[in-house]
Amino acid sequence: MTLGGGLLLIGIAIIQWAKKLMGDHEIVELRHAAGSEKDDIDAVLDDINAGIEESGIARRPLIRNSLLGAMAALGLPAIVLLRDMGPLPHGHTNTVWKKGMRVVNDVSGKPIKPSDLEVGQLVNAQPAVFFETDEHGQHLYHGAELHAAKAKAAAIVVRMRPEDITPSAGRANWGVDGILCYSKICTHVGCPISLWEQQTHHLLCPCHQSTFDLADNGKVIFGPAGRALPQLPISVDSEGYLVAVSDFPEIVTPSYPELARDQKKLDKKFGGNN
């Protein structure tokens, strides 16, 4: 009741303000050119010249040159700040995947065999190097380096019926018995995706609903993503485990302005056959 009464009184006050205190006639203000009049410009220049003459800077070169030198030195801190930004990024078009690296379960680190997958199944995967250790038992990747590498190398492995897959030119041998491996990173803004529709072979991004057809080379069929999901060529090693044939021939990243330029560089590395 109190709140309702307060709102009512506020409404009445607004109405009274509009009726009694605010003017009811229109006022027109003429618009003028944004630039200053020539007379005003000349007057300002005359004032500046008069100030220079009164200060005597023109007759005192030491003071003038010291002032100019001090103004030039103001740019030096900017150079120091630019150096503090750190080294320029490099290797952003690559991931840790390479020829012969095993595809492993992203939780257990267990290598994956084709027999481990059923038709319609999806497994979240990573490169085996993330689980490898050195002679001291320390993981090869750890801390910020591990997180940065995982952000680009995360993958999904799916199995479909071979007859349902329509590979594009040059990709006929990128899979094993209907098993394909794709990047887990959405090409829109980089969200990790693994919402898998078994019947349609579609992969849905939960962030902005970009949808990719994994049976059709990761093609975008809905949503804001601007390019297909990168595919990792895979085969099996001598022990029957899934391994990468190479790194991703396409850049694993959200879209950015220089992407086309960087992709051309990567195409040259892979011979342009992707």
Residue ranges with predicted function:
Residues 4-28, 60, 64:
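Transmembrane alpha-helices and immediately adjacent membrane-cytoplasm interface residues
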Residues 186, 205:
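Short cysteine-rich clusters marking metal-coordination/redox-active sites
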Residues 197-200, 224-225:
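Short linker/helix segments within small regulatory modules
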Residues 213-251:
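Short Fe-S-cluster ligation motifs
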Residues 16-47, 84-185, 191-196, 235-274:
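N-terminal pre-ligand scaffold of iron-sulfur
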Residues 3-14, 71-82:
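Alpha-helical membrane-embedded segments
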Residues 52-70:
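N-terminal secretory signal peptides and thylakoid transit peptides that target proteins
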Residues 188, 196, 209-214:
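Structured cytosolic domains appended to multi-pass membrane proteins
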